[in-house]
Amino acid sequence: MDDLMARIRASSTMPGFMPPVTIEGVEYVDGALGDTGGIPIDGAQLDGYDRFFVVCTRPRDYIKNEVKRPQTLRRLCRHRPAVAEAIIARPARYNATREMLRDLESDGKAYVFYPRVMPVTNKERNVTKLRQAYALGMAQANAELPQWRVFLGV
């Protein structure tokens, strides 16, 4: 169980805000720094899947902006240059993955859930606000459930 908790913590460790998590001698940070910018569709594709149900936490028209001061970031992360470069590359990777999702959606190969309203950020800790955001998401999910069933064939 401790190993599972460490892996969960590592999956949400935001560089610059939290120290990396070490598992079996290897440091880990948030998976959003990977090849798809935080939308883990690549693993499913490598496993041979060709239809996807994706839940996004940003609205449909969201575009992630480039890092404003990459040189400053490189200095701050000088002991972890790969992390700095991944943070700098993340917006382009994320936006490319979102574009790929739009293409998959147009081809009928993806159902992408986009929130109509997202009243909290990923740094929110106020439990009341988090519960309100959860309730909004559940209401939207319940309204879209018939469409989900059609896409999933259930």
Give each language-model segment a name.
Residues 1-154:
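Patatin-like phospholipase
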